[in-house]
Amino acid sequence: MTTKVITAEDVRKVAHLARLAIDESEIEALTQQLDSILDYVNQLSELDVTEVPPTTRAIEVSNVTRPDVLAPWPNREDLLAIAPEREDDFFRVPKIM
């Protein structure tokens, strides 16, 4: 580890903002852990990545889905019968807005 970046006061402030109750032993442990994480991030920022092309994924991934196909349900009444709530021929769902 190079230089200390995170102080105990920083940890207390973040804990307060996040509404976390932590004791002094946790503050000391979190200070060391966060400092180690930031030291590692600092090491990564020193890497020369000018020749590395920007990517969104490390490996190529393709979406393996089928197209949606509209198909009638064999028995509409059976489906509506198991709905928690219904209104005529429709599912009734809670209002969200």
UniProtKB/Swiss-Prot annotation:
Pfam families: GatC. It is an enzyme of class 6 (ligase). It comes from the Bacteria. GO terms for molecular function: asparaginyl-tRNA synthase (glutamine-hydrolyzing) activity; ATP binding; glutaminyl-tRNA synthase (glutamine-hydrolyzing) activity. InterPro entries: Asp/Glu-ADT_sf_sub_c, GatC. The keyword Hydrolase does not apply. Its EC number is 6.3.5.-. It catalyses: L-glutamyl-tRNA(Gln) + L-glutamine + ATP + H2O = L-glutaminyl-tRNA(Gln) + L-glutamate + ADP + phosphate + H(+); L-aspartyl-tRNA(Asn) + L-glutamine + ATP + H2O = L-asparaginyl-tRNA(Asn) + L-glutamate + ADP + phosphate + 2 H(+). Keywords: ATP-binding, Ligase, Nucleotide-binding, Protein biosynthesis. NCBIfam families: gatC. Allows the formation of correctly charged Asn-tRNA(Asn) or Gln-tRNA(Gln) through the transamidation of misacylated Asp-tRNA(Asn) or Glu-tRNA(Gln) in organisms which lack either or both of asparaginyl-tRNA or glutaminyl-tRNA synthetases. The reaction takes place in the presence of glutamine and ATP through an activated phospho-Asp-tRNA(Asn) or phospho-Glu-tRNA(Gln). This is Aspartyl/glutamyl-tRNA(Asn/Gln) amidotransferase subunit C.
